[in-house]
Amino acid sequence: VCRAADGRILLTRGSHRSAFPGVWSLPGGGVDHGEHPADAVVREFAEETGLAVAITGIRSVVADVVALPDGSVEHTDRILYDVTVTGGDLRPETDGTTDLAEWVPPAVAAGLPLLPFTARALGTQFVEPDAVPVGDEPPYRTDRVQRFGAYGLVTDPAGRILLARIAEGYPGGGLWHLPGGGTDYAETPEAAMLRELYEETSQRGRIEGLLSVGHRYDPAALGPEGVPMDWHVIRVVYRVVVEEPVTAAVTEAAGGSTDRASWFTPDEVAGLPLSELAREALAQAG
């Protein structure tokens, strides 16, 4: 979301090459394999609008399932940033999926055809599309994987921290990790986080807010069967509270990526072998 000093919003219009020609959207697009999502939004702004931008905050993380004109169904996870212009000159994209970029007053934007996620982000009233029937998850490559994962820095009223240990045979095996994992097809990140929390630790939690957005790229990762995979995961981390903690136990089926779960005091956590994500989240949370 990029706003001018007078409140106008920067929007782009879908071209004939897009799934929805003539429909307006916030600038942005897909994350390339191995790319940090923050770098992706800066790149997409430059491509679609000619403007250089700097990120000032993370607005939200959302997901939607949309029926495309060709009859297929697409699940998209979206990270919405707040950005400010730092340079460049406004111009349309050339031979891309957008054909116009404009600063639009909010009152005018409310009357434009907007993609649903854009209308929601701007707080504009619109008719919610009908729910899309969701079939089986489309197949994806196993040698080059890009996933979207939701994780939690989980605490209880006593200040303990909940961690899950990565099973041997998985990347990071033996390290203590944040509860969480990949989002399922048609699942929101929040729902995925709470589902994974129960599967990996037997806890029921409440999401209090977003802590961070990041990624991990490991082109030489090995899967559980020892098969090489060009692995890229985009990760969102939430603050999660378990008001009524129970004994931590793994409930997901044998063969999953977690082999143990436990509550720890902050002093105990300091002596554990932690995953990179767990270390980063604990440092960010203070």
Which residues make up each language-model segment?
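Unchanged
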Residues: 31-54, 64-118, 183-206, 214-277
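Local beta-strand/beta-hairpin segments that build beta-sheet-rich folds
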Residues: 59-60, 211
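A conserved beta-turn-beta hairpin within the catalytic core of GNAT-like acetyltransferases
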Residues: 18-22, 170-174
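Acidic, metal-coordinating catalytic segment for phosphate/diphosphate chemistry
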Residues: 1, 125-153, 166, 227-228
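Conserved acetyl-CoA binding element of GNAT-fold acetyltransferases
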Residues: 24-29, 174-181
